[in-house]
Amino acid sequence: MAKAYDHLFKLLLIGDSGVGKTCLIIRFAEDNFNSTYISTIGIDFKIRTVDIEGKRIKLQVWDTAGQERFKTITTAYYRGAMGIILVYDITDEKSFENIQNWMKSIKENASAGVERLLLGNKCDMEAKRQVQREQAEKLAREHRIRFFETSAKSSVNVDEAFSSLARDILLKTGGRRSGTNSKPSSTGLKTSDKKKNKCLLG
């Protein structure tokens, strides 16, 4: 019996507590949103299989607690992660400032060359914005990683962001059969044309 997928990629979401990591995962895996999630205790993961470049990719997306007291738990889960998504809240400047600390944590604990992605979540709350888009774009350029503004609540750019990271991992692992290795700006998930008014990819 043939496998139901061609590749299995482990992804990890990290960032401060309250930035919306769990909501992003639920939106991506189940296309659902619930604003009343309690703060994640320990680690949980969701699975979704997507089609990218003609390949069936099984994405195992791990949620982590942002609180420092759980750091010993999350450190172990960096190992084996092929992609890491750094999440901050556009309405919380401190969560953006702490991205540098999370970058350092990746460097100390993750595999060398792991694919990274920066997400500014809650872009539906424009009136409460504390982190300007240009600030995040600059940080992403400095670290040579992709950047999206997302909204788990409005489903803005969520599929696009996960698909982008999965595609980059596929390219790096040689899963693509033809074409160049330049990072494409388009994504491979078949999704409806969701709202993209204020939260465009960088």
Swiss-Prot record:
Keyword terms of this UniProt record: Cell junction, Cell membrane, Cell projection, Cytoplasmic vesicle, Endosome, Golgi apparatus, GTP-binding, Hydrolase, Isopeptide bond, Lipoprotein, Magnesium, Membrane, Metal-binding, Methylation, Nucleotide-binding, Phosphoprotein, Prenylation, Protein transport, Tight junction, Transport, Ubl conjugation
InterPro entries registered for this protein in UniProt: P-loop_NTPase, Small_GTP-bd, Small_GTPase, Small_GTPase_Rab
Cellular localisation: Cell membrane; Cytoplasmic vesicle membrane; Cell junction, Tight junction; Golgi apparatus, trans-Golgi network membrane
Binding-site positions, GTP: S17, G18, G20, K21, T22, C23, T40, G66, N121, K122, D124, A152, K153
Segments of skewed composition (Basic residues): 193-202
Cross-link (Glycyl lysine isopeptide (Lys-Gly) (interchain with G-Cter in ubiquitin)): K46, K58
PTM notes: Ubiquitinated via 'Lys-11'-linked ubiquitination on Lys-46 and Lys-58; impairing the recruitment of guanosine diphosphate (GDP) dissociation inhibitor 1/GDI1.
Protein name (Swiss-Prot/TrEMBL): Ras-related protein Rab-13
